[in-house]
């Protein structure tokens, strides 16, 4: 069409494309589609998005939609955007309506940072500082899904070594945004915990919340009990009313006095609630160390290494590295998760952007008791 204009840049989501888009339009609103696969707008979808944008004055409007995966159309609802929603993989869908005036302001105020990968991320963070980002809870378009990986595979993109260059850019954009809104954590002001002020029955407790893990729980418990340390420790298993053979298996291991088998009195606990049940128990040690019921420690010295790190770093929380593997312990992609996203000078800020900090995690128990885990079964560890 005569009205069409082709913009050429280094990448669809790069900074130069965002700037080209901003400088090439004088209209009130810009509909931005972030994929190359076929898209079908619903009846009066564009008019509806514009109507809501005008009524709310939003910097950006996004909506629920339908996704076509393997020939099947499914509803794809998205969630509301909040002040703290700075994860770079926040799901807006592939279609967003941008406020033209605020888009042009981005180009006017754009500084020297030119991102190859984080251009769109930088733009939407900027827009969130200019006005609201509004979720329109209506199914307004249909897109063809081009990433058919399972969600369990996608969630590790941020730690895949092949994506390291991408992650560095995302961290830079996120850090600039946090500074702009006055939310940047000053890493020079860390308080150091006092490891000597309280008495504990043991130095460390390995905590294993479990529900119906009859195939893996024995290996996890034995792995924990096999640790070699120069301090006393125990293993606290919170059995959340398993209905398979998990409880029977745990009872068979009870001959080891270091195993503390807890069954909550109520049935309303998620994984986070089970964690609280363990850390508040009288048997919990000075350091509470996570081990999932389907995980194994990589060596018999892992627990010693974790506790040593607490004392060496004067830290309130420790996160180690881990390796993805199958039931036969064969390494699975992306392999070793080394948590390069955490750095001493900016890790606490970058943590707000990424999809969590994986196992093994460990906490100074008095601080964990003070904060408490949310009683959920998803994201409870990341929240802590």
Language-model-detected regions and their locations in the chain:
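A recurrent flexible, glycine/aromatic-enriched loop bordering the glycosyltransferase active site
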Residues: 74-98, 340-362
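Glycine-rich, basic loop-to-helix element that forms the pyrophosphate-binding segment
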Residues: 9-25, 265-283
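A conserved hydrophobic helix/loop-capping motif in glycosyltransferases and polysaccharide synthases
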Residues: 204-216, 220, 227-228, 238-239, ...
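A conserved acidic beta->alpha catalytic loop
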Residues: 1-2, 38-39, 239-248, 267
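Conserved donor NDP-sugar-binding/catalytic core segment of glycosyltransferases
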Residues: 38, 43-75, 301-334
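Acidic donor-binding loop at a coil-to-helix junction in glycosyltransferase catalytic cores
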Residues: 114-123, 378-384
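Short beta-strand-to-loop acidic/aromatic patch adjacent to the donor-nucleotide binding site
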Residues: 26-40, 285-296
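Short, acidic, metal-binding catalytic loop of nucleotide-sugar glycosyltransferases
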Residues: 1-2, 222-232
């Amino acid at each position: 069409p005569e009205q069409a204009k082709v913009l050429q840049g280094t990448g669809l989501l790069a900074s130069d494309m965002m700037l080209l888009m901003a400088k090439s339009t004088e209209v009130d609103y810009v509909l931005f589609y972030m994929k190359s696969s076929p898209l079908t707008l619903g009846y009066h979808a564009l008019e509806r998005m514009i109507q809501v944008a005008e009524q709310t004055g939003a910097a950006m409007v996004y909506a629920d939609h339908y996704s076509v995966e393997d020939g099947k159309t499914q509803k794809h609802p998205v969630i509301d955007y909040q002040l703290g929603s700075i994860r770079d993989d926040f799901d807006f869908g592939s279609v967003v309506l941008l406020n033209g005036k605020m888009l042009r302001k981005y180009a006017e105020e754009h500084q020297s940072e030119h991102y190859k990968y984080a251009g769109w991320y930088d733009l939407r963070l900027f827009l969130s500082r200019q006005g609201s980002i509004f979720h329109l809870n209506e199914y307004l378009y249909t897109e063809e899904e081009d990433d058919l990986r399972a969600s369990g595979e996608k969630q590790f993109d941020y730690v895949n070594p092949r994506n390291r260059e991408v992650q560095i850019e995302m961290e830079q954009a996120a850090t600039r945004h946090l500074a702009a809104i006055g939310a940047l954590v000053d890493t020079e002001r860390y308080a150091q915990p006092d490891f000597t002020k309280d008495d504990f029955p043991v130095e460390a407790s390995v905590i294993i919340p479990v529900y119906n893990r009859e195939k893996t729980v024995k290996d996890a418990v034995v792995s924990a009990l096999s640790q070699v340390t120069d301090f006393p420790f125990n293993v606290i298993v919170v059995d959340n009313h398993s209905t398979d053979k998990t409880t029977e298996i745990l009872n068979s291991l009870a001959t080891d006095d270091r195993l503390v088998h807890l069954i909550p009195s109520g049935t309303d606990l998620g994984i986070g609630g089970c964690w609280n049940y363990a850390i508040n128990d009288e048997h919990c040690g000075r350091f509470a160390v996570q081990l999932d019921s389907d995980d194994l420690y990589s060596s018999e010295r892992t627990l010693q290494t974790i506790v040593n790190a607490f004392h060496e770093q004067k830290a309130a929380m420790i996160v180690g590295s881990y390796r993805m593997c199958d039931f036969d312990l064969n390494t699975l992609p992306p392999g070793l998760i080394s948590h390069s996203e955490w750095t001493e000078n900016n890790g606490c800020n970058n943590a707000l952007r990424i999809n969590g900090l994986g196992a093994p995690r460990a906490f100074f128990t008095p601080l964990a008791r003070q904060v408490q885990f949310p009683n959920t079964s998803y994201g409870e560890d990341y929240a802590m």
